[in-house]
Amino acid sequence: MTHSVDAILDATGLNCPEPVMMLHNKVRDLAPGGLLKVIATDPSTRRDIPKFCVFLGHELVEQQEEAGTYLYWIRKKAD
């Protein structure tokens, strides 16, 4: 599926907790309703990023795995 994103966060090569910490900062800078694509290689993001979205009220639009790379599309909640 193709999504038109407003920002990209490349957390490739980073391990827990860095991807989620970076995600928190990136989402803070995103406009409400904005779409963020996250690229990660840490398998723990499969657990951590969906929980992050539920906890903070953001929408996890889609997630995919491609050869050890994890892709997430997150829509920031409206203020």
From Swiss-Prot:
Any one GO biological process: tRNA wobble position uridine thiolation
Coiled-coil segments on the chain, per record: none
Active site feature: C16
Keywords: Cytoplasm
PROSITE patterns assigned: UPF0033
Gene Ontology MF, one: sulfur carrier activity
Matches recorded under InterPro entries: Sulphur_carrier_TusA, TusA-like, TusA-like_sf
Cysteines engaged in disulfide bonds, as pairs: none
CDD domains for this protein: SirA
Localization per record: Cytoplasm
Protein family: Belongs to the sulfur carrier protein TusA family.
Function: Sulfur carrier protein which probably makes part of a sulfur-relay system.
Name of the protein: Sulfur carrier protein TusA
Annotated source species: Pseudomonas aeruginosa (strain ATCC 15692 / DSM 22644 / CIP 104116 / JCM 14847 / LMG 12228 / 1C / PRS 101 / PAO1)
Upper classification of the organism: Bacteria, Pseudomonadati, Pseudomonadota, Gammaproteobacteria, Pseudomonadales
Protein's gene: tusA
